[in-house]
Each structure stands twice: as structure tokens, then as C-alpha cells.
Curated annotation (Swiss-Prot):
Kinase keyword on record: yes
Lineage: Bacteria, Pseudomonadati, Pseudomonadota, Gammaproteobacteria, Lysobacterales
CDD domains: ASKHA_NBD_PanK-III (cd24015)
Stated role: Catalyzes the phosphorylation of pantothenate (Pan), the first step in CoA biosynthesis.
GO molecular function: ATP binding; pantothenate kinase activity
Organism listed in the record: Xanthomonas axonopodis pv. citri (strain 306)
Cofactor info, note text: A monovalent cation. Ammonium or potassium.
Gene3D superfamilies assigned: 3.30.420.40
Protein name per UniProt: Type III pantothenate kinase
Assembly notes: Homodimer.
Keyword Hydrolase: no
Positions of ATP binding: D7, L8, G9, N10, S11, R12, F13, K14, T121
Binding-site residues, substrate: Y91, G98, V99, D100, R101, T171
Catalysed reaction equations from the record: (R)-pantothenate + ATP = (R)-4'-phosphopantothenate + ADP + H(+)
Involved pathway(s): Cofactor biosynthesis; coenzyme A biosynthesis; CoA from (R)-pantothenate: step 1/5
Length: 242
């Protein structure tokens, strides 16, 4: 494959070949805040063009770019723009709109009107109208980050473990139920507002490594594991057009 897509998140790294205007088979692994496993870097593919999106720490981003520059003829870095492929971002300063959110909207454009919820280190929510207009969104801590923050302030509260129940009778379940429930409630409230505001039914798309535990609580949601990479494929196609 001569063209590849790379998505470097806050805690996970994904890449896939570019197949037409979609991402091919995705490979992914976790990484540290400032470093990535040397063996993983050595296993990266090579080719003609690497399309790269990153919200990771600058040092890790620069290391990844340098590594890809040794393997690819061109390395193209994605930046959020006010408009792309029929999508118009609501932010007055598009550079402050995260590139992961930008690409997720590009990946979801065929499903609009849609609410896109990304569950990773953060919980991000964005609403996209059928005309391609972004209607804004929200950012909150994801359930995983909520648990880690509670554990950091109160070490007796475990950072993981437990099951979701409506009214828990032990601490582990209470933590899972509270944190997952808070995320689901924010998504549901945002979806209700979007439907009132737009006056039409709004689809719900979720993505991100932290999304699967929330899916049983969001029965109308569609999970798109490769949504950001699909958006990156759309961006790459648009960038290559004359």
C-alpha cells in the first residue's frame, strides 16, 4: 500500500491503509504520554504518502513524524480548517477545534444529521446538520478519566473494576455506574437538545476506545471504531483533488 493513514491520540495509536476514500484494516495499540514502544515504531509500514493526525503530546508527535519521514516520500499533517468536504466548523477560530473532532465529523458526514460522541481520554460531543454545518459540542472527562481522577484524589477508590447497575450496593459498581452513567446522561441530553434544535431525528454515532462499555446503555447508537481514520481518508481524498 502506498498511502497510509495515521491517528495518534492521547493514549492510543491507530493506522490503516487508504482504500479509495475509506480506511482499510486498522491496527492499534496503546502508548505512553511521552513515548511509544521502539518495536512498535520499527514495525510501521512504508510507502509514498503518510497522512497524519495527532492530538498527542508535542514530543511524541514529533518523534512519530520523524519516524514516518524515514519511511514515506511525503508526510502530510492534518490541521483543522473552517471548511472541508462540505463540512463547516462552528468555531470562530477553527485552529482551536481538535483535529480528532474535525476528522470524526468528516467521517460522519454521510450520516448527518448526527451527533458524534468520542470516548477516549476525553468525552467529546459534536452535532452536525444535514447541510454540513457543525452546530457546536461539548468536552468532558471520559469515564476512564473520571475514575483515574477520583483515584488520584482518594486512593481508596479503585481506578478500575466494577459493573454498571442502576443502584449499586458496593463501591466498585457504584464508581462504574456513576462514571458511565454521567457520560451516557451527557450524551443523551445533548442528543435531545440536538433533535429539538434541528427539528428532525438525529442519529447517534460513537467511537473511541472507551465507547464499548457505554453501548449497552445507548441502544440506538452506532459504533464506528474507525470513524477518525475514515475522516482522515476523506481529508486525504480532498487534499489530493485538483
Amino acid at each position: 500500500m502506498s498511502e497510509w493513514l495515521f491517528d495518534l491520540g492521547n493514549s492510543r495509536f491507530k493506522y490503516a491503509p487508504l482504500h479509495g476514500n475509506r480506511a482499510g484494516q486498522v491496527q492499534a495499540w496503546a502508548h505512553g504520554a511521552e513515548a511509544m514502544d521502539a518495536a512498535a515504531l520499527a514495525a510501521l509500514p512504508s510507502g509514498r504518502i503518510a497522512y497524519v493526525a495527532s492530538v498527542a503530546a508535542p514530543a511524541l508527535t514529533q518523534r512519530m513524524i520523524a519516524c514516518l519521514q524515514e519511511r514515506f516520500t511525503q508526510v502530510r499533517i492534518v490541521r483543522t480548517t473552517a471548511e472541508c468536504a462540505g463540512i463547516r466548523i462552528a468555531y470562530a477560530d477553527p485552529s482551536r477545534f481538535g483535529v480528532d473532532r474535525f476528522l470524526a465529523l468528516l467521517g460522519a458526514r454521510g450520516d448527518a444529521p448526527v451527533l458524534v460522541a468520542g470516548v477516549g481520554t476525553a468525552l467529546t460531543i459534536d452535532v452536525l446538520g444535514a447541510d454540513g454545518l457543525h452546530h457546536g459540542g461539548r468536552i468532558a472527562a471520559s469515564p476512564t478519566t473520571m475514575r483515574e481522577a477520583l483515584h488520584a484524589r482518594a486512593v481508596q477508590l479503585p481506578a478500575s473494576g466494577g459493573d454498571y447497575v442502576e443502584l449499586a450496593i458496593d463501591t466498585d459498581d457504584a464508581l462504574t455506574s456513576g462514571c458511565d452513567g454521567a457520560a451516557v446522561a451527557l450524551i443523551e441530553r445533548s442528543l435531545q437538545h440536538a433533535q429539538r434544535s434541528l427539528g428532525v431525528p438525529v442519529r447517534l454515532l460513537v467511537h473511541g476506545g472507551g465507547a464499548p462499555p457505554l453501548l449497552p446503555l445507548l441502544p440506538d447508537a452506532t459504533f464506528r471504531a474507525a470513524l477518525v481514520l475514515d475522516g482522515l481518508a476523506t481529508w486525504a481524498t480532498a487534499a489530493s483533488s485538483p
